[in-house]
Amino acid sequence: FKYDTPSMQAHVKAVFQDHKFVSDSDSVPKVGEPFGILLDQTNMYAESGGQQADTGSLVIDGKAEFEVTDVQVSNGYVLHIGFLKYGTLRVDDQVMVNYDEARRRPLRNNHTGTHILNFGLREILGDHVDQKGSLVAPTKLRFDFSHKAPVNVAELAKIEDMSNDFIKRDVNVYGKDMSLEEAQKIPGLRAVFGESYPNPVRVVAIEFDVEEMAKDLTNPRWRSTSVEFCGGTHVRRTGEIGRLVITEESGIAKGTRRIVAVTGDEASEVSRTAEEAAQRLEDI
């Protein structure tokens, strides 16, 4: 997957603050306030497609360290936003780019979890379910979708069970760039209605290899799994997610529902709390 190298070398191409480019970090107009660094390449994920940005650092060993608190795309460029901890960063400096794995890991879990949840919603509620929005944060995932009625407890249980079956089976997650025209032929492919996608487009599939799909585009087998257009970060195997627990279901607009869920350590904590509460009720 893209962005998977935890550390990589890059060169500073620009220093940016308050709509101005400067030659080095000593020349930023507003000292003490965050500014941006543009690199020739990066392993950090900029906020996009509902997934929150990576954090991390840009380091010149022993000479300078820049703490990255946010990564955003601005006019097609990836801007690393943050604060200089010490030293000076100049245009053409070589830096080590390090993302924070402790933040990236739950983001990966929650993003692949969102794909699994999307598939489960369609399977249990019907093909009319379309994604209306999403949030992938380290602590939770949120998914908005088209559906006219509240999702009842039995349906939520089925969706959660189907999601956890994917996780327990510990199947591979695949990603590959394909031409938009070819990718749109894959049966069961999920995309956000009205969204403009690049060409080529990145296809992320669970269990079946995207390269295998590309050789047999119309095979109905592909309907039996999650296949989506996506440029985000994902786990390599579904077992890494640990568990998915739905914590909330609500209506946010006419014909639009919202589900909030947690994965990994957060899911274990929520389950433990629920079990303790159930035990206390039993004891009353």
Give the ranges of each region predicted by the language model:
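A glycine- and charged-residue-rich anion-binding loop/surface
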Residues: 1-284
